Regions:
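Extracellular carbohydrate-recognition regions
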Residues: 25-65
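Beta-strand-rich interaction surfaces with strong enrichment in secreted/lumenal proteins
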Residues: 35-36, 99-106, 194-201, 242-243
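Short tryptophan-centered beta-strand motifs in secreted/extracellular beta-sheet-rich domains
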Residues: 50, 115, 205-214, 218-220
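Short carbohydrate-recognition loop motifs
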Residues: 74-97
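Secretory/extracellular carbohydrate-interaction modules
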Residues: 89-177
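Short, aromatic/His-centered strand-loop micro-motif at the edge of beta-sheets
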Residues: 164-208
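Short strand-turn-strand beta-turns centered on an Asx-Gly dipeptide
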Residues: 221-227
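Flexible glycan-contacting loops in extracellular carbohydrate-active proteins
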Residues: 230-258
Length: 262
């Protein structure tokens, strides 16, 4: 292997956001029930049961502090319908050039969300991507920190702060493409450690998910049962300013709670 490309990506790693060395995970340290952990240890920052009507299709039409980031791209198309206490999302992804993206203020280092949701079965590839954002973070694309992504077949947990959304990583990929260089296999292997995929078959029933970050770990539970946990430095970011979710087609949200533990 030519030493110079490897040296270049090692130097690139030095430009990624500095974080303390990851502590070893204590044996059996994670709570067995993250819903109970949030409720017992956390402060409820926000709750919405969507018992109202939307006021229009614009940025703030959902009300109660929510913002629909893609609404103003297609003001004549309704992407959110508040119906009988349910936020029914129907993303106009093709028309907007982006999946429906809805967010609300959060504000914690450790904490998380409890969300009651349902895939209504109106489209084949319904998915739900939810996680945390810090738009004040300038070295990560749009401040995207970390996400859980529910598809019809699996659950993905991903650290985007030190992974795919890091601007230094994006620059390396762009530079490699411009120079017609093959991706460095060691660098790509490092990036793969930022993501974990767990098989999880979707259905059309109502479920309650819990997504938390605690230090270097992000955990996902469904109906009170742990499904997946992943450790990566980006999860330890000290300010998750927004709770954010995206949908590529249709998903229904019945209840959202945001908790701060630290």
């Amino acid at each position: 292997m030519n030493a110079f490309p490897r040296l270049n990506w090692l130097l690139l790693l030095c430009t990624l956001p500095l974080v303390a060395a990851e502590p070893a995970a204590p044996a059996s340290s994670a709570p067995t029930n993250d819903t109970a952990w949030l409720q017992a240890k956390g402060t409820l920052l926000f709750h919405d049961a969507f018992e109202r009507e939307e006021t229009g299709n614009g940025l703030k039409g959902i009300g109660n502090g929510w913002e629909s980031a893609t609404a103003d791209r297609i003001p004549k198309i309704k992407q959110v319908d508040l119906d009988a206490g349910i936020m029914k999302i129907a993303s106009a992804t093709k028309e907007a050039g982006h999946a429906a993206h809805i967010h609300h203020d959060a504000g914690f280092a450790d904490g998380g969300v409890i969300v009651r949701f349902k895939f209504p079965g109106l489209n084949k590839a319904e998915n739900l991507q939810l996680g945390f954002v810090d738009r004040e973070l300038k070295d990560v694309w749009a401040g995207h920190l970390c996400y859980a992504i529910l598809s019809q077949t699996d659950l993905t947990l991903t650290d985007r702060k030190t992974g795919s959304m890091n601007l230094a990583v994006k620059k390396k990929h762009a530079d490699d493409a411009a120079a017609k260089r093959k991706p460095d296999p060691e660098f790509e292997a490092m990036l793969k450690t930022k993501t974990q995929v767990t098989p999880l078959k979707a259905d059309t029933e109502w479920h309650v998910l819990t997504l938390v970050t605690e230090g270097y770990e992000m955990r996902f539970s469904l109906d009170g049962k742990p499904v997946a946990a992943h450790r990566s430095p980006g999860y330890a970011h000290d300010m998750k300013r927004w709770f954010s979710f995206l949908a590529n087609s249709t998903v229904w949200i019945d209840d959202v709670k945001i908790y701060k533990v630290r």
